[in-house]
């Protein structure tokens, strides 16, 4: 089973990178991890490459990284929107759409979940703090190992009902 993993561009150093843990976990589960850096050559090349790649993989991991260009969901960029890489955005949006069309399993990690949302027509809050929605800093710093984040659940909401009135539960051993 071939599982594609998108990469993150390190502009300061001029290379693509991936979290080695993603590769290790896929291999431990019996899969073959394959890194998927964006194709050079502009938007059309990136979209064509995404189409080709999607037909050759059995699953997709859309990894974390910088912000998505707000122009892709028809908004002006805020000063807080950082680390936008246009080629990556176009490539991953196309990958997400083709994976959806082909009914491939997709795991979106942080930015990856946002890519799936925008690729299928959704929008985003560019910056939760700038929009006045939270005082929590959602931008994780190295070593990028935070495994959880607190969320308040509105009483009586669908989520509260799904959680059976227990919005605060403990993490399983080994998941902390």
Language-model segments: residues:
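The feature captures the ABC ATPase H-loop/switch
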Residues: 113
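N-terminal beta1-alpha1 cap of cysteine-dependent amidohydrolase-like domains
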Residues: 1-107, 117-125, 129-166, 172
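Histidine-centered catalytic micro-motifs
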Residues: 175-176
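Conserved G/P- and acidic residue-centered "switch" motifs that form tight phosphate/ATP-binding loops
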Residues: 110
């Amino acid at each position: 089973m071939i599982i594609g993993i998108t990469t993150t561009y390190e502009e300061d150093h001029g290379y693509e990178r991936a979290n080695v843990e993603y590769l290790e976990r896929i291999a431990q589960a019996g899969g073959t991890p394959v890194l998927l850096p964006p194709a050079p050559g502009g938007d059309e090349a990136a979209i064509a490459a995404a189409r080709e790649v999607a037909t050759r993989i059995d699953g997709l991991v859309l990894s974390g990284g910088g912000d998505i260009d707000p122009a892709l969901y028809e908004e002006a960029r805020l000063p807080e929107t950082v680390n936008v890489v246009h080629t990556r955005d176009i490539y991953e949006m196309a990958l997400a759409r083709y994976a959806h069309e082909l009914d491939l399993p997709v795991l979106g990690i942080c930015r990856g979940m946002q890519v799936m949302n925008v690729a299928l027509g959704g929008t985003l809050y560019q910056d939760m703090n700038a929009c006045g929605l939270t005082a929590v800093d959602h931008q994780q710093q190295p070593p990028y190992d935070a495994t959880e984040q607190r969320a308040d659940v509105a009483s009586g909401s669908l989520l509260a009902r799904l959680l059976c009135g227990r919005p605060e539960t403990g993490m399983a051993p080994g998941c902390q």
